[in-house]
Amino acid sequence: MNSHFLTNDLILEVLSRLPLKSVARFHCVSKRWASMFGSPYFKELFLTRSSAKPRLLFAIVQNGVWRFFSSPRLEKSSSTLVATAEFHMKLSPNNLRIYHDNTPRYFSIGYASGLIYLYGDRYEATPLICNPNTGRYTILPKCYTYRKAFSFFGFDPIDKQYKALSMIYPSGPGHSKILTFGDGDMNWKKIKYRVLHDIYSQGICINGVLYYLGDTSDWDNDHDVTSGNVLVCFDLRSESFTFIGLECGQLINYKGKLAVIFWDDVDDDDVKDDAIDEMHVWVLEDVEKKEWSKYAYTWTEDKLYRSQVSVVGMTASGEIVFSMRKYTSEQPFYVYYFNPERNNLRRVEIQGFEAFTKFGTVYTFVDHVEDLNVYNLKHFKSVHPPSVQPEYDESDSESEEDREIII
């Protein structure tokens, strides 16, 4: 049937259900279709469809080379015990290697509204933003710092702007800076803050606020500033800081609110091999009033080992998601869904990594959506067409860390 006999609304309704890669191809069909796909109405419709079915995003790094996969996020009504991951891309433009490290001082990774931010662990490393679905990327301007700064990434949903935050060492020279991505010439600009603090965690962005863990106890701040471990809240729109006293834990998105996971017997910085079957969850209900809701959960099936899994978030239906930290083709890779209402734990095997990589460290994100607003961002370049055939880089030598087997 000729498309001229179909209404625009019907065409848009059908096409909004397609994957991002397919929509991108249809841009070339005609000027009419290109115009429709570029309209704010279709972009919002497509994002609404994608947000209704968020996916798990897996970023696997092996010797500085990153590969991205995604799989359906299985809700609690699903009885499926196996899910297949779709391979999206291998990120290695011009043989660039982005090395990772478990310490946020040396390596930063962030996810915000469809984009991944990486700042590698090496001298002269540069920050990079990429779209894990399409392979488009940009390398941000270098930001001079004493040694290497802590770095974070987030999205302001009101002004619809992505921002990268670079925080210097409190005792070092220079200035903390922020960069707005997507418009203009992408220059870093100075930001002011009065509270000196050490930084202890990666950041997480929720509804335009960046959160990370820090410590003010070693610095001479004003008397009204909490001394000790703190939750740092940075509003991306106003570019202002708030500090809340809080012990160290693990930060997750809890149905659109910031939550902190605590284990019953260990400090979060001290990852043990002991099996765990209990956790405490604090949900930040009000930032200004510093009010928390507190929950404690236990389970009996499939005891987990903190050295092998991490909490990565919560689904819209209220299940807390755990993911394995390491992948090896010699054994299955699992994601766990914990239902607080029933106190039960589901284990789902993720298949599909083995065709593209043998081993690696895995970073998992719970609420990955495809957003057309990030498809044609001004500064993005194209990586070589994403490989869709199974491939190994036999020249990559296995490091001692990557050789760890998870039981």
Curated annotation (Swiss-Prot):
Which InterPro entries does the protein's record reference?
F-box-assoc_dom_typ3 (IPR013187), F-box-assoc_interact_dom (IPR017451), F-box-like_dom_sf (IPR036047), F-box_dom (IPR001810)
**SUPFAM superfamilies documented for this protein:** F-box domain
**Species, as recorded:** Arabidopsis thaliana
Q: Which CDD domains match?
A: F-box_AtFBW1-like
Protein name (database record):
Putative F-box protein At2g16220
Q: Which Gene3D superfamilies match?
A: 1.20.1280.50
Give the span(s) annotated as Disordered. Answer: 385-407
- Domain (F-box) spans 1-45
